[in-house]
Amino acid sequence: MVKLWAIVVMVAIALLRSTFAKQLSCTMELDRSCSLIGAKVSSDEILTTTFASSNPSTLSTVQFARSSLTGIPPAMFQTFPKLESLNATGSDIKQIQSRNFADAKTLQSLYLRGNKIHDLPDVAFFGASRLQTLDLSDNAIATIESTAFKRLRELKTLLLGSNSLTELQPGVFDDLSDLERLELQQNGLGSIDDRLFQGCHSLTALNVSHNALKTFNVAQFERRWSFDLIDASYNKLSVVRIPPNLRQLVAIGNGIRTVESTATNGSELILLKLPHNKLTSVDEVPVFDKLITLDLSFNRIREFDFRSAARFGKLVLLKLDGNQLESVSNSLTAPITHLKYVHLADNQFTHLDLNVLRTVPRILKLDLRRNQLERLAVTDLAGSFPVMVRIMLEGNRFRCPDSRPLLKELKESITAYAMTRNDCRKEENLIDGICCS
Ligand SMILES: *[C@@H]1O[C@H](CO)[C@@H](O)[C@H](O)[C@H]1NC(C)=O
Ligand SMILES: *[C@@H]1O[C@H](CO)[C@@H](O)[C@H](O)[C@H]1NC(C)=O
Ligand SMILES: *[C@@H]1O[C@H](CO)[C@@H](O)[C@H](O)[C@H]1NC(C)=O
């Protein structure tokens, strides 16, 4: 008898469950999208939850807001067979099961940023073969099975930043032949295998910053076409080897002492940003003939001659702020006209003669802030630097009597320089726009 009752109760519960299986409804807007606000799906409801909307067969976009879903109910993709974009950002999602997206045949964008996903199982996105954008940033992903991204041959953007990855399985990106942009920043990656990206024939932008990489073979991205940007900042690299097809390399805050080029016949590099590393000379950077921006600020450079800048025939912006320069020299015999912006702030100049820049006549902006300049000499500013529109002098220690000749030159030129009272230290006076004492 007791047994029978138990069975009756269980059957009743089962019936109730299916009769009252959770249904999430939304109203389709004119743009074929709908929002599900405040939806709640617990782990035992994932497989039974159903969806409803007016005209579900044409719905293209679903957006969750203020929702708490343990997982994405697969019924969504059966009810909305034309779904192209699903945004479940910040929705408390904890799990993705293998083939969760088996029916997501038209899905192109999947936004799962800011959830609580710990792992991506085998064939996690199997079925969603039209996917182009997959945002998994800011989760707690520590494990990605090697087939998790299987068959995502149209995927262009994969965002895995701010997770807990310490390693990546060989082959995990092998099917991503259309992938253009990959974000892996802010994980705990200790190494990246040289063959990890061998299947990613279209990759042109990669962010591996804020990991724990001791080595990273940038040269593996040598291809016949150009690779746009690699950001390897805030790792523990001491060497970078730059392939000829790379256009921009950013590697701030490593321990880089050596920069190499693997180019034998010209390089595509236009931007090289290496602040906060351990380089001791501009000449340690090999020649890149198309380089436009070279940022070596906050390294350990003690000497600089403008001849080093002339090695880069297209260089426009040179940043050497925050080094240990006490002076600069110039052994150039012919002028260079490409260099237009020179940053020398936060060095240790006490005296500087601007005539040292006479072979850089097209300079537009010169930054000398926060040195210890007491005197800045120049003869014929307007004539030597006819296009210099700005000189930045804040945070120095100019002597008032010594700055009169400089002021005269400045007033006769187009160069803006003026400081304000706020730029001066307490004991300083502001005289004709220059703080001095
Ligand atoms: C996804 O939703 C979040 C808020 O829930 C919003 O901030 C974000 O812009 C949306 N993303 C897209 C691509 O619509
Ligand atoms: C790479 O990611 C870091 C951290 O999120 C970010 O600050 C940086 O701007 C990104 N790099 C590029 C080139 O977008
Ligand atoms: C080097 O580059 C020039 C022009 O960019 C090209 O004509 C030449 O064939 C290249 N040589 C080699 C060995 O690739």
In which residue ranges do the predicted regions lie?
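Solenoidal tandem-repeat scaffolds enriched in leucines and small polar residues
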Residues: 126-128, 132-264, 268-278
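LRR N-terminal entry segment and analogous cap-like coil->beta motifs
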Residues: 31-92
